[in-house]
Amino acid sequence: MSKLLGSEILGENIKRLRLSCGLTQEQTVARLQILGSPLSRSTYSLIEMGRGNIFVNDLVGLQRVFNVSYEEFFKDIPPSRSSKESTP
């Protein structure tokens, strides 16, 4: 399974989306588990704090739970630069 690297901004965006839906972490995780995700609340909490990695399938689940576009998750995250681009 593919993972997305942890990011503080990604975590903040996930938290913002959860709160805008009026959900607690427990409610969000319960909905993800109904969709087949084995994600625990403690792991979800780490993701929101930008200290944990998220599986792509869990991001897909969050998109369904929050009913938002994928762009909302990556809002305000600057594009990464490859090492080739940063070398003079």
Predicted feature descriptions by range:
Residues 1-21:
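A short, Lys/Arg-rich alpha-helix, primarily the initiator
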Residues 14, 25, 41, 56-59:
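Helix-turn-helix DNA-binding elements, focusing on the entry/boundary residues of the two helices
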Residues 22-46:
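Short alpha-helical DNA-recognition segment
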Residues 51, 55-72:
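DNA major-groove recognition helix of helix-turn-helix/homeodomain DNA-binding modules
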